[in-house]
Amino acid sequence: MERNLLSILMRRRLAERNRDAIELAAVQKMEVIGSTEGYTFDDGSDHDDVTKIFVGGGRQGIHYIEFEYVKNGQLESGVHLGVRYRGFTETFEINHLNNEHLESVEGYYDYGSGYIQGLQFKTNFRVSELIGYDEGTKFSLSVKGKRIIGFHGYMKERKIISLGGYFSWIHPRKMEAKGSKGGNQWDDGTNNDGVTKIHVRGGVEGIQYIKFDYVRKSGQHINGSIHGLSGSGFTQTFEIDHLNNEHLVCVEGYYDDESGVIQALQFKTNIKTSELLGYKKGKKFSLVDKRKKIVGFHGYADKNLNSLGAYFTTVSPTKSECYGSSKGIYWDDGVFDFIRTVYVSSNVMNVRYIKFHYYNRAVVVRQHGWNSIVEEDGEKEFELDYPNELITSVEGTMKSFSRSEIRISSLTFKTSKGRTSPTIGIASGTKFLLASKGCAVVGFYGRHDDRDLVAIGAYFSPLPPPTAEKLQAQGGNQGDSWDDGVFEGVRKLYVGQGKNCVAFLKVVYDSNTQVVIGEDHGNKTLFEVKEYELEYPSEYITAVDGCYNKVNGTEVEVITMLRIQTNKRTSIPVGCESNSSFVLKKEGYKIVGFHGKASNMINQLGVHVVPLTE
């Protein structure tokens, strides 16, 4: 009976995989929006991506459109639709070599004239200007999780009267499994929108099993399969709130070569970081791909988890509102990996130009506004600590000089390290803010005329989770090593004094709003144990200073004094000062964990730090 049940479960699982494979391979044709009373055109779906779009139009709407595609690295032209004549012509290029793809088309259709009036194209990196007019009924061609690979539609009297598209899944990138290939290979697949819950079972030998719950692209929730076997040990879970745009971006862990078993795992989302689940033993590894999220896992497992790999897909940036004038020349820098430097020139009236030094494997310079540097226009520079510092918001003002003339009058930049640039320009007029919670600026767009910057907006992408840095421990070399690990922050410390030394340390941490009580290090004595409670989360530890020395006429060095510094106050020292002093601190960082060595006293102390964010 058990064999029959197992056979049924295996057949069901195989059927699900086959169905997923068919869904992933299928091209979806979205029917046209607009009129069908004309001549049909169809570029087909036998393309990898759209690379360039030409659009022409006039007073009656869009009368010319042409698409360029790529197939197996070769460029292909679609059907020439309509006729180019007097009016406007715009070109929108898509950099498929940088993994940019077309995700949607929005437009306006006028039922009175029967013509498409305007079109706007959105990729996974940027959004085009509206080409044409926002008159009539708005429509959209888009399918969640898919990209456009072809177009079809109708035309009449040399004008475009309807448009439809062909869609294909955006295939996630497979990152090979870290660990050994012992045991049975497993693969959860890629037909998911995200990970919602992770179940980890650990034991003496390492991670026994892992299980992932997913949300499908259709919105259906899937309880994943167990990979490995359950034994005596601990089970921990980590939940991800996908309904509030939280997604998994990184997995770190440890793998033991000798046993061939994953020893520990830690999960990071765009919002929070889990505890280290398991033991810090063996080689460290990570599964991460910049500006992408994890949508599936694969690996090997038998009695324990032997290896783990992941599937990544792009997280599309969001585009803020553009503040300022709707007139002038439209510009759009798109999306970059980093912003290294911002230059702004202003006079007593307004901002003249803005210049960015972006970085995408090389420095890319973009300047918008007045192109000539004039002596009275002082250029101000704001340099970021690339790649560790990101712009998180831009405050500005815009000023009306007449009913139709609006200009940007000032700009101020804030960063992920809590720095604020000087205000560049004169802060007068209407205030505006470019910001998105939990995100960093990855590009700008806007408008300029022949003299000044008249409008500005920004692209935002989720901030990467802060990466902890382990600062070297200070003190003696005797005692047993210990490491509390990395947490969201510190809530409370207990520091106990011994005879001429610090004898005891215990730390209470915060992990995803949950209180985590650290282990005892050293021994309590008859002396008082001092308690330091922080006003968490507004208060955090910025530094620990102390002293160490040999005690009791021996060669054993121990910590003799500790003092805690926060962003709000400095504690009274515990212990006695001695000749050898130290400071555990990194500018612009906060302490989120402790490590060191201990016997019946605290012999050595070090810290884990992460960059300060807003």
UniProtKB/Swiss-Prot annotation:
Residues 27-169, 172-314, 317-462, 468-611 form the Jacalin-type lectin domain. InterPro entries: Jacalin-like_lectin_dom (IPR001229), Jacalin-like_lectin_dom_plant (IPR033734), Jacalin-like_lectin_dom_sf (IPR036404). Keywords: Lectin, Repeat. Pfam families: Jacalin. The keyword Cell cycle does not apply. SMART domains: Jacalin. It comes from the Eukaryota. SUPFAM superfamilies: Mannose-binding lectins. GO terms for molecular function: carbohydrate binding. CDD domains: Jacalin. Belongs to the jacalin lectin family. This is Jacalin-related lectin 14. It comes from Arabidopsis thaliana.
